[in-house]
Amino acid sequence: MLLAVIALLSLAAGTTTAEIFTNTFLVRMRQPAERHVADRVALRNGFVNLGPVLDSQTEYHFVHRALPHVRSKRSVPHMRRLKVDPLVDTAIQQAGFKRVKRGYKPLSVDNLVPLYEMKNPGNPGNKDPTDPFFKYQWYLKNIGQNGGKPKLDLNVEAAWAQGVTGKNVTTAIMDDGVDYMHPDLKYNYNAKASYDFSSNDPYPYPRYTDDWFNSHGTRCAGEVAAARDNGVCGVGVAYDSKIAGIRMLDQPYMTDLIEANSMGHEPDLIDIYSASWGPTDDGKTVDGPRNATMRAIVRGVNEGRKGLGNIYVWASGDGGEEDDCNCDGYAASMWTISINSAINDGQNAHYDESCSSTLASTFSNGAKDPNTGVATTDLYGKCTTTHSGTSAAAPEAAGVFALALEANPQLTWRDIQHLTVLTSKRNSLFDAKDRFHWTMNGVGLEFNHLFGYGVLDAGAMVALAKKWKTVPPRYHCEAGSMFDTQEVTSDRSILVKIKTDACAGTEYAVNYLEHVQAVISVNATRRGDLELFLTSPMGTRSMILSRRVNDDDHRDGFTKWPFMTTHTWGEYPQGTWLLEVSFNTQTPQHGWLREWTLMLHGTKEPPYTGLSAADPHSKLAIVKKAHEERLSAI
């Protein structure tokens, strides 16, 4: 069934753009071949073998150095030459596409602070870190700095007080490189788990430019694992954890193979992969992982960490209210944890996207005062206080998850998602424009369309992780489909129902939900005016697509696009699901809903049976009670 899910999602298509082709090729052998055999095949055909794809013995990554790095047409002669080789089955020239960093702002020298400026030697009587920039790290300890709301932070001190600091956990920063010689990073750098896929060597050091463009990965790394009490910059969320650098964003175009090999690199050495990038946040792009990348992620969650599953953390996106992160196939994947941001007074940042796939939030900047940015490491051994965007939010979450994995190394990738739902806090997070309010789902869990289930609470997550019991097996139920084309107009929305028993009586039965996907094909005279809502049998209404004012598409629409919601977490899926398709516009528009498949993902058994809930007001206690009441009513 999982293979069917992968096949379905690999067909998903969104925005069509003019294709660009690179000088790299995916080459499939007729039968398994060792690396030296693939090397000979490449050499005799004028190529260089860069290595296997996802450790495969049948798929290899070839490059032709004489071809331009970027071209507008396929190189048919080179593909033909490969295909006639007796050992080669197929050869596919790699298309190039854009991936952008989230939250990067051009820097001036004024943004940067010399390494030892404001150095404050350690005070043995002070429990706080003595690092000079800790005072600026309000997201770690908010005492009201710069107009912030006291105690609106990640509550990391409660985790540190339990003796948990990220030991024996490695987080890979998939980005433009990591300055692993930075004095605040070098002792926590895991060289064995690192690689440069932009240059194909083991040294993922950033390429320096005059505009400091490639500082992004180094900044993200410091948020996770900057050392404590060394008089340098600030401190990482998990300051005793390790970081790996995976340089993969610094080439003219991204390819499926670069992404796949990055996300599948050393899955038993790397625990967490942190990504602060994605498709262009322009409010009109619909894009996501290609085939090999999808396979890499699925392999990671199923086989990584010796079968426990890798954790993929994704920045939700910086397109603001004009974009929707459910149009980003990375952030909206059920195999990733999508993280949004709030600023120091609890409101959303102006660049935050909203969507139903966001699981939780951390912190970034967005206020007028530049000192409310994220303080972290920077290039040339310097420090910054202006790291920004959801780029800054995702590594904070990775750091919190590193703390949880130290507390309980046996946590699976799904355990981390359950812990996120159960321990994140509403706190004082709010929508500055009063569009999205906190809502309770059918089993009593509060969620928000901007913030997911709230801000991560490191202390609470670590405490629950220590006593956690692994959740029951996960099943995938194709709950129903609709293939009758229906027209929707700007003055008449359509409502489509699927009634399901959630695969009851089969091996795929789902009784307690985790993720829900509505896999939809729809076209419109203006795609950006479409809105989609999914209502569960327990009455939870998720906006799975919001209006995108910049999206003028009238041709592509969405083809088998998996719109995902986490808002029904813990609910019972049996009953009638309602899909609403409408236009949000004053201009006459029309469109066609061509198909809809409802995919339910969750457990057959109650997920928290083996856990005790000491606090009757905790999320765990609330959900357990709802599940127990349901069982007693059956």
Locate each region found by the language model:
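Structural recognition of the beta-strand scaffold that forms the well-ordered cores
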Residues: 25-26, 61, 90-92, 170-174, ...
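Protease zymogen maturation seam
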Residues: 83-170, 183-188, 195, 200-201, ...
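Subtilisin-like peptidase catalytic core
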Residues: 148, 156-158, 169, 176-181, ...
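Extracellular S/T/G-rich loop segment that most often corresponds to the catalytic His/Ser-adjacent loop
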Residues: 175, 328-406, 410, 449
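C-terminal subdomain of the subtilisin-like protease fold in secreted/lumenal serine endopeptidases
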Residues: 265, 270-274, 309-310, 329, ...
